[in-house]
Swiss-Prot record:
Its cofactor is Mg(2+); Zn(2+). This is DNA-directed RNA polymerase subunit beta'. It catalyses: RNA(n) + a ribonucleoside 5'-triphosphate = RNA(n+1) + diphosphate. It comes from Bordetella avium (strain 197N). Binds 1 Mg(2+) ion per subunit. Binds 2 Zn(2+) ions per subunit. SMART domains: RPOLA_N. It comes from the Bacteria. Coiled coil: none annotated. GO terms for molecular function: DNA binding; DNA-directed RNA polymerase activity; magnesium ion binding; zinc ion binding. Zn(2+) 2 binds at C814, C888, C895, C898. Its EC number is 2.7.7.6. InterPro entries: DNA-dir_RpoC_beta_prime (IPR045867), DNA-dir_RpoC_beta_prime_bact (IPR012754), RNA_pol_asu (IPR000722), RNA_pol_N (IPR006592), RNA_pol_Rpb1_1 (IPR007080), RNA_pol_Rpb1_3 (IPR007066), RNA_pol_Rpb1_3_sf (IPR042102), RNA_pol_Rpb1_4 (IPR007083). Mg(2+) binds at D460, D462, D464. DNA-dependent RNA polymerase catalyzes the transcription of DNA into RNA using the four ribonucleoside triphosphates as substrates.
Length: 1413
């Protein structure tokens, strides 16, 4: 029977394809798809339920309703296959064809396609060079359009109203031709000469110089060239034939009760057909023009609604007043075709259940409930039952399984053996959210999960559910086992730290075991080996924490690399000695000989992984877990009220704080401080008091008094349960303990401001009603924040994945020697991230040379692993140039050397690894841990931030950076006059140890090359004011400084001294008052000039400056001329957390961005305009560049100052686009990486830099053509970098001029939408716009990325899929070569083709042959 069925199966050929092209369909093409014209709007007969003939469900056009059965029932059964019934006209075939056969409607009047009309920018408008408004008037029959002017002075494409048309007709008769409606538009499109238009436009482009015009022309040129290249005729944008979707894709389903549920499309099609038929009839009847016009307009509207309902005018609604879902709505949005069905599918062979903990499991196992396994593995069980002869048919087997015969369970055990299943916990934020395990059958209905993988899944056992999936094919099982098994994924791909780190009970147990206790039972006993310790412990002679001495066996490698046992004596504790049993060999006992806190255990597992390999580490982690659980149980640690010790000093501290607050209140009431200052001070006092109570409490908790062996009183670390839990990292933190036993402290109001009365009680004492009420707000806000955060974080991840999804490692080495120099990250003199952490796992770009001996220590192209990084540290290299994804020269994808180590595997990255997606997941996954709020810096918060001096942290020599400029004043002090001055401290080897920024006007207390001790002051400054320092000496001459006009006199009430303050000038009668400034005059009465130029020194003062010199006063170099109070700086909102990360990746320009100098040159000020000041920079060639700066901005430079290109000249946050333009890609990358890292570092999240670099590479993947040279581009066009480089290679090979370009920084959303793959862009956002554009350009999608391939249903070109695609392409090339060779043999006299082609192809490996490495 089966063989018989196979005979009748139609041969469905698997189409192999390499690209998908999208275009416009010509009317002929649409007719060729069609199986017949739909003439009637009827659907099915309401009595017989049979489809009406020529209707929307017609069986003649679309195929039979039942398999192999015509409609009237004359032909049934397979034997009539392919017969067309003469009675009802239906072909006898499978009913499945109703899903693929299309019909068509011949439109009585042409109709413009709404996408090309209304999708902005309007493509029709661009081609015709008319405004959208005009085209709409023509299309919807409100105006006439001249098609052929003939001999008249009218222009082609001119728009005329009805009255105009009548007037012109009277004037010229029928010398000209004008039409209205889609016919007019179609005629215009048909008669357009694209080649000529392109020529003219190219000519205009060369001739014009106005920016706006160039932009406009190049846009139009691009569209026209698209038509030219793709061979699509513009008049196809107007349809004469409308295709009809196959009926099974717009089904009509009978509901019970004789009603029908139908797809909205049927309604929309019915309207089109009705109006079209009416129009046909009117045309036959030769109805008056005005009626026809109305009918044509209605037809146009009906077709518009079918294609994209609601795009123009009011949306068509059904009977129940809801908008009908049109064809465009079917594909776009979250529930559209792309995101609902193509990118996310539901899968068979899956189940979900609650998870419980399975501490007895090994790391690679999970507990699967028997009933679930029975259901999931049904087909395998059926197969097995048949093979064993226990069941003859599937049906019988089904019966056996359903009755749950004992034999079935045995078979289930067999089937499940070595068959991994995949577990997934939603939300799957990174690749560790799905892992494979070997199932172990268990009773019950809950899945058991190994405790160590919880961190990776972010799972807990408070009711979480997980889904199980079964990989079916052998290949799938193999991949699940080798790539996804939990024991093969022990490192986080985000940062290379172990992911199987014990937590909570396990940590507590291990910590409790490895602590020491002074004077424990049996202290100081010597033991021969661990077994003896175990006996003594079992007999109660010693406690776990007793200090003892014991002989332990360790394993070390000898010269031959064999393991040799070594016995050493260690002073340790009983617990540690017993734990030493589980150490893998290769780790010395010293790693265990300390109290194991969570960080220590993580480091221990990391060390084990690097030294002993994966297998031993997994076994070790499992044993650690078992011991931890056992010991925590044995330890019997619990919490009691008594453990929360309230510090005795609490009352004293609170009383003291209360007194200080009263004092401040008194000052306020006598008017000495303002209310704002009083509030700030009060908040400050209570904040400090809270910290003091917390400190006192921790001191009391952390230690306890004991008597040691010699009878002395000593303090030891406490065994208080709460303290142990926090200290070990098992649960809780100092801040939480402070609320339990200290005081709760200050609370925030709903608007974010701090309530000035703190909660002085703690949870042990209990809160009163008011205190409880105050604290409710904060608790609720936390919950609301979390919900918002999750959604935002998910959206950020989606955008990141979308922009990087096509980035895959495609080759081993691109051969570049470019890279970025890495140094240790230093901020405020402290090393935040040492050099070793930054270069670990990267590849050296150039040889690394020992600074002392000048010998090459590490050659270029070496992967820097732990040992090499240690070597670099030892040798004393402080700057290493490493390869980075940003400088990789691979065209599509990345090379393995530029990426470096695969952090999730700990080895060199493999070709085919989807590093883009991994980067996106690594950045998006911790997103939910980031905060959502915007911080207001001001008041109490900023006071702590005011520094007024820098000190060295280490001994060394001072070195001034090249940017550091200073003058020496009369007292011999050095005064800094550079904006970006830096000062470094070098150690004896000349390595930079620390680096400090020195602000403008600071007094530098050390000289270049001075030796300093740690703690030396380097520079001091006044934190509250910013000085203006004179760089030259002379007598002061005031200009434009008039009291009451530009300055005001302020008298200090306390001291009686008066100062001049610069105010906003009052303009009198339109006379513009110059800005107040001073010139310096030398002894001869001439203006002092700036050294090396003939500019006079003039120093202008900003509004709010306090002038400290008098007119005519002699000033020396380095003297302060004026001070600008810093209080006047407004409180800035600092965007933090998730919004800040999104802002950086979207490359948004900040609201009031700072300005960077466009050129290197000298600053001067021009004439001010209204509300703006004019700043001029004269470059070295003497060309001046002007900038207008709003008055309220703070200018950081003054007259005569020399600035470097890219230096800050106006205060404010930096704009990434400016950084890219003025300082280049490297600076931009550093800026984005550092800023993103700052946000994550604040939350204690570790992410490797290279992930952020990968994203930045994708943001920089487009370039802007400035000069096309001889290449095939348009000026101002944005193209993919790889496309540009390929084109330039081609042009250079022909000895022509390559195109010049600028780098462009795109935000991640923009970058995703501007990708070359239209499928990927359409499935991301703005589907209609993307598809419209792609169709006109006749775009071809080469299916390079992962997303496109998922959508078309192929294996993705990453991992094992990449190998598959490469092999497939090789095979195709080989077959082509063989065909070519065969053709040559058959016809030897034909001209020989170029031999090179064939040679290249034949040198590919043949089947069964492996390519030589």
């Amino acid at each position: 029977m089966k063989a018989l069925l196979d005979l009748f199966k139609q041969v469905s050929q698997d189409e192999q394809f390499d690209a998908i092209k999208i275009g416009l369909a010509s009317p002929e093409k649409i007719r060729s798809w069609s199986y017949g014209e739909v003439r009637k709007p009827e659907t099915i007969n309401y009595r017989t339920f049979k489809p009406e003939r020529d209707g929307l469900f017609c069986a003649k056009i679309f195929g039979p309703i039942k398999d192999y059965e015509c409609l009237c029932g004359k032909y049934k059964r397979l034997k009539h296959r392919g017969v067309i019934c003469e009675k009802c006209g239906v072909e006898v075939t499978v009913a499945k064809v109703r899903r693929e056969r299309m019909g068509h409607i011949e439109l009585a009047s042409p109709v413009a396609h709404i996408w090309f009309l209304k999708s902005l920018p309007s493509r029709l408008g661009m081609v015709l060079d008319m405004t959208l408004r005009d085209i709409e008037r023509v299309l919807y029959f409100e105006a006439w359009c001249v098609i052929e002017p003939g001999m008249t002075p009218l222009k082609r494409g001119q728009i005329m109203s009805d009255d105009d048309f009548l007037a012109k007709t009277e004037e010229y008769g029928d010398d000209f031709r004008a039409l209205m409606g889609a016919e007019a538009v179609r005629e215009l499109l048909r008669t357009i000469d694209i080649d000529r238009e392109v020529e003219t436009l190219r000519g205009e482009l060369k001739a014009t110089s106005s920016e706006a015009k160039i932009k406009k022309i190049s846009k139009r040129l691009k569209v026209l060239e698209g038509f030219q290249k793709s061979g699509i005729k513009p008049d196809w944008m107007v349809m004469e034939v409308l295709p009809v979707l196959p009926p099974d894709l717009r089904p009509l389903v009978p509901l019970d009760g004789g009603r029908f549920a139908t797809s909205d499309l049927n309604d929309l099609y019915r309207r089109v057909i009705n109006r079209n038929n009416r129009l046909k009839r009117l045309l036959e009847l030769k109805a008056p023009e005005i009626i026809l016009r109305n009918e044509k307009r209605m037809l146009q509207e009906a077709v518009d609604s079918l294609l994209d309902n609601g795009r123009r005018g009011k949306a068509m609604t059904g009977a129940n007043k809801r908008q009908l879902k049109s064809l465009a709505d079917m594909i776009k949005g979250k529930s559209g075709r792309f995101r609902q069905n193509l990118l996310g599918k539901r899968v068979d062979y899956s189940g979900r259940s609650v998870i419980v903990v399975g501490p007895q499991l090994k790391l690679h196992q999970c507990g699967l409930p028997k009933l679930m396994a029975l259901e999931l593995f049904k087909p395998f069980i059926f197969n097995r039952l048949e093979m064993m002869g226990l069941a003859t048919t599937i049906k019988a087997a089904k019966k056996l399984v359903e009755s749950q015969e004992p034999v079935v369970w045995d078979i289930l055990e067999e089937v499940i053996r070595e068959h991994p299943v995949m577990l997934n916990r939603a939300p799957t934020l990174h690749r560790l959210g799905i892992q494979a395990f070997e199932p172990v059958l268990i009773e019950g209905k809950a899945i058991q999960l190994h405790p160590l993988v919880c961190a990776a899944f972010n799972a807990d056992f408070d009711g979480d559910q997980m889904a199980v999936h079964v990989p079916l094919s052998l290949e799938a099982q193999l991949e699940a086992r080798t790539l996804m098994l939990a024991s093969n994924n022990v490192l986080f791909p985000a940062n290379g730290e172990p992911s199987i780190v014990p937590s909570q009970d396990i940590v507590l147990g291990l910590y409790y075991t490895t602590r020491e206790r002074i004077n424990g039972r049996g202290e100081g006993i010597f033991f021969a080996d661990v077994a003896e310790v175990q006996r003594a412990y079992d007999n109660g002679e010693v406690e776990l924490q007793t200090r003892i001495t014991v002989r332990l066996k360790e394993h070390e490698r000898d010269e031959q690399g064999e393991w040799q046992p070594v016995i050493r004596r260690h002073e340790t504790t009983v617990g540690r000695a017993l734990l030493s049993e589980i150490l893998p060999r290769g780790l010395p006992f010293t790693v265990l000989n300390k109290a194991l806190k969570k960080k220590e255990i993580s480091r221990l597992i990391n060390q084990s992984f690097r030294r002993c390999g994966l297998r031993d580490t997994v076994i070790f982690a499992d044993k650690l877990m078992q011991s931890g659980f056992r010991l925590a149980t044995r330890g019997g640690i619990s919490i009691a009220m008594e453990d929360m010790l309230i510090p005795a000093a609490k009352e004293v501290i609170l009383a003291e704080a209360g007194r200080e607050v009263k004092e401040i209140d008194k000052q306020y009431s006598s008017g000495l401080v303002t209310s704002q200052e009083r509030y700030n001070n009060v908040v400050d006092i209570w904040g400090k008091a809270g910290d003091k109570v917390g400190k006192a409490m921790m001191e009391q908790l952390a230690t306890e008094p004991v008597v040691n062996r010699h009878g002395e009183n000593v303090r030891q670390e406490s065994f208080n349960s709460i303290y142990m839990m926090a200290d070990s990292g098992a649960r809780g933190s100092a801040a939480q303990i402070r609320q339990l036993a200290g005081m709760r402290g200050l609370m925030a109001k709903p608007d974010g401001s701090i309530i000035e009365t703190p909660i002085t009680a703690n949870f042990r004492e209990g809160l009163n009603v008011l205190q409880y009420f105050i604290s409710t707000h904060g608790a609720r806000k936390g919950l609301a924040d979390t919900a918002l955060k999750t959604a935002n974080s998910g959206y950020l991840t989606r955008r990141l994945v979308d922009v990087t999804q096509d980035l895959v490692i495609t080759e081993v080495d691109c051969g570049t020697s470019h890279g970025y120099s890495m140094k240790a990250l230093v901020e405020g003199g402290e090393v935040i991230e040492p050099l070793r952490d930054r270069i670990l796992g990267r590849v050296a770009a150039v040889d690394i040379v020992n600074p002392d001996t000048q010998e090459t220590e590490i050659t270029a192209g070496t992967l820097l692993d732990e040992d090499l990084v240690d070597l670099i540290d030892r040798v004393g290299v402080d700057e290493v140039k490493v390869r980075t994804p940003l400088t990789c020269e691979t065209r599509h994808g990345l090379c393995a050397h530029c990426y470096g180590r695969d952090l999730g595997r700990g080895s060199h990255v493999n070709v085919g690894e989807a590093v883009g997606v991994i980067a996106a997941q690594s950045i998006g996954e911790p997103g939910t841990q980031l905060t959502m709020r915007t911080f207001h810096i001001g008041g109490a918060a900023s006071r702590s931030a005011l520094a007024s001096a820098v000190e060295t942290k280490s001994n060394g020599t001072v070195g001034f950076a090249s940017t550091m400029r200073y003058v020496t004043n009369a007292k011999g002090e050095r005064v800094a006059i550079s904006r970006s001055g830096e000062l470094a401290i070098y150690d004896d080897n000349g390595r930079e140890r620390e680096r400090h920024k020195i602000p403008y006007g600071a007094t530098v207390l050390v000289g270049d090359g001075d030796a300093v001790k740690a703690g030396t002051r380097l520079a001091t400054w006044d934190p509250l004011t910013r000085p203006i320092v004179s760089e030259y000496g002379g007598a002061v001459r005031f200009e434009n400084i008039e009291e009451g006009v530009t300055v005001a006199k302020q008298v200090d009430e306390v001291t009686g001294l008066s100062t001049l303050v610069v105010i906003t000038p009052k303009t009198r009668g339109g006379k513009v008052v110059m800005r107040p400034q001073i010139k310096l005059v030398n002894d001869n009465g001439e203006d002092v000039r700036i050294a090396g130029t003939d500019h006079a020194v003039n120093i202008s003062f900003p509004v709010g400056a306090l002038i400290t010199v008098r007119d005519g006063q002699q000033v020396a170099v380095g003297e302060v001329l004026a001070r600008i109070p810093q209080e006047s700086q407004k409180t800035r909102d600092i965007t933090g957390g998730l919004p800040r990360v999104a802002e950086l990746f979207e490359a948004r320009s900040p609201k009031d961005a700072g300005m960077l100098a466009e050129v290197t040159g000298t600053v001067s000020f021009g004439k001010d305009t209204k509300g703006k000041q004019r700043l001029v920079i004269t470059d070295l060639e003497g060309i001046s560049h002007e900038f207008l700066i709003p008055k309220e901005k703070q200018v950081l430079v003054h007259d005569g100052q020399v600035v470097n290109k890219g230096e800050m000249i106006v205060d404010g946050p930096a704009d990434p686009h400016d950084i890219l333009r003025l300082q280049g890609i490297e600076k931009l990358a550093t800026y984005i990486v550092d800023e993103v890292q700052d946000v994550y570092r604040l939350q204690g999240v570790k992410i490797n830099d290279k992930h952020i670099e990968v994203i930045v590479r994708q943001m920089l993947r487009r370039v802007n053509i400035t000069d096309p040279g001889d290449a095939d581009f348009i000026p101002g066009e944005q193209v993919e970098r790889s496309e540009l480089l390929n084109e330039n290679d081609r042009v250079i090979a022909e000895d022509k001029r390559p195109a010049q370009y600028d780098n462009v920084l795109l935000g991640i959303t923009k970058a995703s939408l501007s990708t070359d793959s239209f499928i990927s862009a359409a499935s991301f956002q703005e589907t209609t716009r993307v598809l419209t554009e792609a169709a006109i350009m006749g775009k071809r999608d080469d299916l390079r990325g992962l997303k496109e391939n998922v959508i078309v249903g192929r294996l993705i070109p990453a991992g094992t899929g990449l190998a598959y695609h490469l092999a497939r392409k090789d095979k195709e090339a080989l077959e082509a070569a063989e065909r070519e060779a065969a053709r040559q043999q058959a016809n030897p006299f034909e001209e020989m083709p170029v031999a090179a082609d064939i040679e290249v192809d034949v040198s590919l490996p043949f089947e069964g042959e492996t390519p030589a490495e």
